[in-house]
């Protein structure tokens, strides 16, 4: 068996949600179904605005009578505040888990839970005594994630700007289409049933090193998307796939920061909206 690579993820924090009403509260507001934790160790989910856009994305694991949420560290305090707004009189305690750290491993290391977003991504572990930070391992983890086409909030899209389908929640087991209502559910359900998500995050390969997140992606002189994270010549970009298909039919390629790039054909074929030619 291949030894697992393990990387401390210092950009991740942990929020603890506990108490007898913890499950009821979370299940009423997040995109995924907590009952999945009856048969798997972790779920991926988001908390949306009433307009259906992603405010936070996180992993959820059981913790006694409550749950731990593995979230971007710079979003942890905001998540605590947002969850507290929905708490009202529910018997729930919400706080950052002081000292908790998150590790990623690939393949999944002993003591870790499988990352629910992709079968080849590996595992995650919340720990009070994690491995030491290794910049090389951290970069290797994100290169692995990018190669598999798995986006991450704050690195591939800005929180508050995109819908779950645009960030591939429907592809990464991040949203339930069978559970009851949650915040933003009507918009997400409508987009799913109509198949009209025009913007999607896809893998791209470039002629040279790719520019930073947010750099415009151009088809000729027309902006059709924005760059996300990258590792060398490979990266993730959010593209208007209907426009990209249109321009590709005219022989117009893509550039980003002056660098030529090619989107992954399999991603485009799988994710292009039903209305695209």
Predicted regions: what is each one?
Residues 21-26, 76-80, 129-134, 210-215, ...:
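Short, conserved charged micro-motifs
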Residues 3-9, 13-16, 56-151:
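Acidic, low-complexity central loop/insert segments
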Residues 1-2, 43-57, 108-112, 188, ...:
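Short amphipathic beta-strand starts and helix->beta connectors
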Residues 33-34, 83-91, 133-141, 219-224, ...:
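A common structural junction motif
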Residues 138, 144-170, 207:
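Short, conserved active-site entrance elements at the starts or edges of catalytic domains
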Residues 1-55, 64:
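Acidic, proline/glycine-enriched N-terminal capping motif
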């Amino acid at each position: 068996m291949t030894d697992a690579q393990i990387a401390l993820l210092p950009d991740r924090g942990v929020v603890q949600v506990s108490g007898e009403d913890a499950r009821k509260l979370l299940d009423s507001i997040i995109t995924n179904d907590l009952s999945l934790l009856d048969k798997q160790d972790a779920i991926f989910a988001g908390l949306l605005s009433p307009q259906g856009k992603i405010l936070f994305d996180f992993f959820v694991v059981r913790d006694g009578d409550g749950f731990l949420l593995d979230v971007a560290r710079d979003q942890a305090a905001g998540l605590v505040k947002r969850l507290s707004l929905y708490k009202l009189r529910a018997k729930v305690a919400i706080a950052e888990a002081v000292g908790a750290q998150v590790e990623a491993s690939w393949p999944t290391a002993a003591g870790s839970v499988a990352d629910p977003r992709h079968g080849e991504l590996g595992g995650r572990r919340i720990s009070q005594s994690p491995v030491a930070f290794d910049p090389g391992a951290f970069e290797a983890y994100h290169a692995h994630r990018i190669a598999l086409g798995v986006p991450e909030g704050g690195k591939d899209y800005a929180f508050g700007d995109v819908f779950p389908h645009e960030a591939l929640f429907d592809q990464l087991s991040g949203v339930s289409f069978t559970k009851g209502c949650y915040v933003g559910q009507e918009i997400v359900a409508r987009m799913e049933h109509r198949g009209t998500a025009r913007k999607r995050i896809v893998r791209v390969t470039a002629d040279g090193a790719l520019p930073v997140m947010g750099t415009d992606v151009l088809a000729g002189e027309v902006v059709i998307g924005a760059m996300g994270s990258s590792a060398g010549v490979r990266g993730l970009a959010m593209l208007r796939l209907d426009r990209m298909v249109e321009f590709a039919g005219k022989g117009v390629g893509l550039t980003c920061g002056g660098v030529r790039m090619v989107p992954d054909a399999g991603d485009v074929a799988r994710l292009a909206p039903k209305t695209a030619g």
